């Protein structure tokens, strides 16, 4: 089953961290990603650019409203993700707990809901 591991962290805190800490974190993420690839669970993963360059889009009454910045002002921001394929939620949680981001922020584990399961007529 596929799971999305969402990585939340405090952007301001990460930006203020010493350069050496950033280098160490990058190395830790590189090792983590390689471990996922070697285990055959890695499908995709990327870091996201800072929320200050994000755009929020809403459509109401046929009108598109575009707002600079993220949807919500929170202490932790979505900073990256991994898409993995593992047997069950326990395995996904195990991989999330090993992510370097789990030690500095919050990991959210979301099962992927294949469209064929909830809209079979549209995927035939």
Model-identified regions with their sequence ranges:
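Conserved, structured core segments of small domains
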Residues: 1-124
């Amino acid at each position: 089953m596929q799971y999305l591991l969402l990585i939340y962290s405090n952007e301001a805190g990460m930006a203020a961290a010493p350069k050496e800490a950033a280098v160490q974190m990058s190395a830790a993420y590189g090792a983590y990603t390689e471990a996922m690839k070697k285990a055959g669970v890695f499908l995709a993963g990327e870091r996201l650019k800072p929320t200050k360059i994000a755009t929020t889009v809403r459509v109401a009454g046929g009108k598109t409203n575009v707002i600079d910045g993220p949807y919500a002002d929170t202490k932790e921001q979505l900073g990256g993700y991994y898409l993995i394929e593992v047997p069950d939620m326990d395995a996904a949680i195990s991989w999330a707990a090993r992510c370097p981001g789990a030690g500095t922020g919050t990991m959210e584990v979301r099962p992927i809901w294949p469209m064929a399961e909830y809209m079979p007529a549209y995927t035939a």
